[in-house]
């Protein structure tokens, strides 16, 4: 079966009250439209066609890199009119799958079933029963249960509005009859629009069987029209992600307080994740990784046995096995920690590599640096990497000991097994195996008295 996925994404989304097109709002870190595109890609369709409209330049700027055919709907006159814009991309022998850019939770298995029901004499239609069907087109069946037509709510009679089975808008149909029915669409309805749903009655009139498929859960076909619905779908999505991770062996201390806004590309055994953790981008977690509360990770690789303690922020970093990071640590992009490294509280590491067993435990900034094996960096150490024009590197060789409150003014090299005395400002390379310090000699002044404050005269005096 040759399938063309047609994603309708031209709606303005006025109820979002946003300058951003509705389909560019995000769930799970991805635009609504990108969720739908990924579904089409997973189905291995021959071509994906995206019909866009409101905020078209923004949509193309954000997602124009996707390998899809983009077609503009300059005047928005309904779903039937949107499909008409793509008619030149529809082959007679192809199966057209109509999806919506604001329905992001649809499952691949559901759509595969729908496609299976579309054939030479049948039209596949995705419907769902809702306790509150307000706002949806109703599925009208005859006494034997055969689908006859779809009636939009504004055009429905009171009896038809009582029907709980509704149209999701998602359907699959062969190209040749679809093109024929599109030509016959009329806009003589309450909205003055061309309804794609009208093709159902045309199909029935020609003897086609309407094969209605139901999703596993109504959540799959929920759309986004306002911020409240966006938040509701975000929670539904995150519940699914949390359940999937627990099924893969992850311990989540509270699944309701975990957000995955990307994908875990590698997952080891016995991973534990505490509350209020956010994972973004591509994340790799090795065996027995422990992630503490209130941690943010983005595009990060974490080796086995690593502990990331509370309130740490890590982005674009690689952390070697058995390392310990935090609490309140920050690793910025292109930071690479080897095995057994310790990064402690209120330490920031930026674009630096730190070799096996080295420790930066307290209140330090390590930027544009290379730190060797077994190095101890004392509290309050700063690599002064920026001269106002360019960044420069600091190199600390194996076994060095950096005393507290040290400034290393780059470019500078600290030699192997060197010791830097506390409170030093190092501006030149230091030799191996010796003590280097640059602080002024301590002086005690005997008999010195602290100045006294002038005594204020009272009013009585």
Curated annotation (Swiss-Prot):
InterPro entries: Bifunctional_GlmU, GlmU-like, GlmU_C_LbH, Hexapep, Hexapep_transf_CS, MobA-like_NTP_Trfase, Nucleotide-diphossugar_trans, Trimer_LpxA-like_sf. The active site is at 362 (proton acceptor). It holds the Pfam family Hexapep. UDP-N-acetyl-alpha-D-glucosamine binds at residues 8-11, 22, 73, 78-79, 100-102, 137, 152, 167, 225, 332, 350, 365, 376. It catalyses: alpha-D-glucosamine 1-phosphate + acetyl-CoA = N-acetyl-alpha-D-glucosamine 1-phosphate + CoA + H(+); N-acetyl-alpha-D-glucosamine 1-phosphate + UTP + H(+) = UDP-N-acetyl-alpha-D-glucosamine + diphosphate. Signal peptide: none annotated. GO terms for molecular function: glucosamine-1-phosphate N-acetyltransferase activity; magnesium ion binding; UDP-N-acetylglucosamine diphosphorylase activity. The keyword Heme does not apply. Binds 1 Mg(2+) ion per subunit. Its EC number is 2.7.7.23, 2.3.1.157. It is found in: Cytoplasm. Mg(2+) binds at residues 102, 225. One of its GO terms (cellular component) is cytoplasm. Keywords: Acyltransferase, Cell shape, Cell wall biogenesis/degradation, Cytoplasm, Magnesium, Metal-binding, Multifunctional enzyme, Nucleotidyltransferase, Peptidoglycan synthesis, Repeat, Transferase. Residues 228-248 are annotated as: Linker. It comes from the Bacteria. Residues 1-227 are annotated as: Pyrophosphorylase. Catalyzes the last two sequential reactions in the de novo biosynthetic pathway for UDP-N-acetylglucosamine (UDP-GlcNAc). The C-terminal domain catalyzes the transfer of acetyl group from acetyl coenzyme A to glucosamine-1-phosphate (GlcN-1-P) to produce N-acetylglucosamine-1-phosphate (GlcNAc-1-P), which is converted into UDP-GlcNAc by the transfer of uridine 5-monophosphate (from uridine 5-triphosphate), a reaction catalyzed by the N-terminal domain. HAMAP family: GlmU. This is Bifunctional protein GlmU. The gene is glmU.
């Amino acid at each position: 079966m040759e399938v063309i996925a047609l994603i309708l994404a031209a709606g303005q989304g006025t109820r979002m009250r946003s300058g951003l097109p509705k389909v560019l709002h995000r769930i799970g870190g991805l635009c609504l439209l990108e969720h739908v595109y990924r579904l089409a890609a997973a189905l291995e369709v021959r071509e994906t066609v995206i019909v866009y409209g409101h905020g078209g330049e923004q949509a193309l700027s954000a997602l124009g890199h996707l390998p899809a055919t983009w077609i503009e709907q300059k005047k928005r006159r309904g779903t039937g009119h949107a499909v008409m814009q793509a008619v030149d991309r529809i082959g007679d022998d192809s199966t057209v799958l109509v999806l919506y850019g604001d329905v992001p939770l649809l499952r691949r298995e559901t759509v595969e079933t729908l496609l299976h029901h579309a054939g030479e004499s049948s039209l596949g239609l995705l419907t769902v029963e809702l306790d509150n069907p307000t706002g949806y087109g109703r599925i009208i069946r005859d006494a034997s249960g055969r689908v006859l037509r779809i009636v939009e709510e504004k055009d429905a009679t009171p009896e038809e509005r009582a029907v709980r089975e509704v149209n999701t808008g998602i359907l699959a149909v062969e190209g040749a009859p679809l093109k024929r029915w599109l030509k016959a669409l009329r806009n003589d309805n309450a909205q003055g629009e061309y309804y794609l749903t009208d093709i159902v009655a045309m199909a029935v009139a020609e003897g086609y069987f309407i094969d209605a498929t139901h999703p596993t859960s109504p959540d799959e076909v929920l759309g986004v029209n306002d911020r409240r619905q966006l938040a509701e779908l975000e929670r539904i999505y995150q519940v699914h992600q949390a359940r999937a991770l627990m099924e893969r062996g992850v311990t989540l201390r509270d699944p309701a307080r975990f957000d995955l806004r990307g994908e875990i590309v590698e997952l080891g055994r016995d991973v534990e994740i505490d509350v209020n953790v956010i994972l973004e981008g591509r994340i790799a977690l090795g065996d027995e990784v422990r992630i503490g509360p209130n941690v943010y990770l983005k595009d990060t690789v974490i080796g086995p046995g690593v502990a990331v303690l509370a309130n740490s922020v890590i982005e674009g970093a690689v952390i070697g096995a058995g390392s310990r990071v935090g609490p309140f640590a920050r690793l910025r992009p292109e930071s690479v920690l080897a095995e057994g490294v310790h990064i402690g509280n209120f330490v920031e590491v930026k674009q630096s590599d730190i070799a096996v067993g080295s420790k930066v435990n307290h209140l330090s900034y390590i930027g544009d640096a290379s730190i060797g094996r077994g190095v101890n960096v004392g509290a309050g150490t700063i690599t002064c990497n920026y001269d106002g024009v360019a960044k420069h590197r600091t190199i600390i060789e194996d076994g060095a000991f950096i005393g507290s409150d040290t400034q290393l003014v780059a470019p500078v090299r600290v030699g192997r097994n060197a010791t830097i005395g506390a409170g030093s400002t190092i501006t030149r390379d230091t030799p191996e195996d010796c003590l280097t310090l640059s602080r002024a000699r301590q002086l005690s002044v005997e008999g010195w008295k602290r100045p006294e404050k002038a005594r204020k005269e009272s009013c009585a005096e």
